[in-house]
């Protein structure tokens, strides 16, 4: 299924016979794999033995994003098992702030190992590598990232890791310790934010999406804004910790204390 998804992930028409030949599978096997992808929520159209994966929104432009986020390296994938897993596996080749960005992940997960639903090109899904002084509280780090996202998106935060819009979950944050090396805690921070979900999407809790704020929202613009705000807040946190200004902004953006 993952090989078929990779073939379809450029969202260009694919001829049935070409897919069978490239993947070395039979007609029945192709039909079974297509059915599994559709069951996973992917919108795959079929006409005259031609298949097309239809994205929820236009695919991201990794070159434009890399330019905007320089000097950090952006590792873009149309599909991957997990962005957190990618950062963890590549940690020895990354520098602080490098990130992995994906249109669709097949094994995404949230807090406590919960599966993270991931429509194709309907969210912002990314993870980045960060390193901090072990004397800094990890709880504080999660608060800082949550506030930065809420500031960038004009939304609310709910401790410990939820981003809310109109009282419904818009996104989440997952912070994991990779190792304690060279006097630093090396971390991977994973973030998922709903931008536009298909009407048929089934989620077990009330959810929100950024198209509620702006039906014409641009994912690239929002992604860059969110990441830049996160890195700015993290730099401030490393210098000043949780100070009075931060606490006031946290209260202002807290779902239960803000306006």
PLM feature spans:
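N-terminal lobe of the biotin/lipoate ligase/transferase fold
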Residues: 2-146
């Amino acid at each position: 299924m993952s090989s078929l998804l990779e073939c379809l992930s450029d969202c260009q028409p694919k001829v049935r016979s070409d897919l069978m030949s490239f993947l070395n599978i039979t007609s029945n096997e192709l039909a079974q794999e297509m059915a599994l992808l559709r069951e996973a929520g992917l919108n795959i159209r079929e006409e005259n033995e031609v298949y097309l994966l239809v994205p929820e929104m236009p695919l991201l432009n990794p070159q434009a994003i890399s330019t905007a986020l320089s000097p950090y390296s952006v590792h873009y994938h149309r599909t991957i098992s997990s962005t957190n897993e990618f950062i963890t596996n590549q940690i020895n080749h990354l520098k602080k702030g490098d990130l992995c960005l994906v249109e669709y992940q097949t094994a995404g997960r949230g807090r406590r190992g919960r599966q993270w639903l991931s429509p194709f090109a309907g969210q912002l899904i990314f993870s980045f590598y960060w390193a901090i002084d072990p004397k800094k509280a990890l709880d504080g780090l999660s608060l800082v990232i949550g506030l930065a996202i809420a500031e960038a998106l004009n939304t609310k935060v709910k401790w410990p890791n939820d981003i809310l819009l109109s009282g419904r979950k818009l996104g989440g944050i997952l912070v994991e310790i990779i190792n304690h090396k060279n006097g630093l805690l090396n971390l991977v921070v994973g973030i998922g934010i709903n931008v536009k979900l298909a009407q048929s999407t089934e989620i077990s809790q009330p959810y929100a999406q950024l198209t509620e704020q702006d039906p014409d929202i641009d994912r690239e613009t929002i992604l860059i804004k969110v990441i830049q705000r996160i890195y700015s807040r993290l730099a401030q946190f490393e210098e000043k910790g949780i100070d009075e200004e931060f606490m006031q902004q946290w209260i202002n953006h807290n779902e239960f204390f803000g306006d």
